[in-house]
C-alpha cells in the first residue's frame, strides 16, 4: 500500500487530482483499517490526500482526527463520522483501538515503564482493561512490551514509530 501511496507524492494537475480522488479516499480508509499503519502524517503529506474535498472531505477530517486529538477528544468527536463509518464498515470500537495505537506510538522512547493508571488515562480506557489492551497491542506488533502485574506497569521496550523526529533518531 505504501508503494502505491508514493504515486501521489508528485505534483498533480487539477484534472489528475480529480482522477486520483477516489483512490486517495480508498487509501485513507485502508490505512485506517490496517492495524499496522500508524504513520498518518505520511498520508497527510500527500497532495492527493490533502486535496480530498466534497463528499470525500469527511475522510480527510477523520484522518486528521487521529493526529490532532488525544484519546479522550477522539472519542468525543468520533460520532460525527457515523455516516462515513457505516458506509466504510468501520466500527467505533475499531477506531478507538486504532487511535490508542497511534497514541501509544507517539510516546517518547526515552521512557519505558508506564503505570497502568497512567496508560489508562492516556488511552482513555479503564485501568482494568490495560492488560488486555497491552496483550492485543503486543500481538498486533504495535509494541514490544512486558506486563508486570506485581508493579502494575507495562514495560514498553519499543513501539512502531509514527514519524522519526530528531529526538528519536538520537535515541536510536
Question: What residue spans do the PLM features occupy?
Answer:
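Charged, E/D/K/R/S-rich low-complexity terminal regions of large eukaryotic assembly subunits
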Residues: 2-172
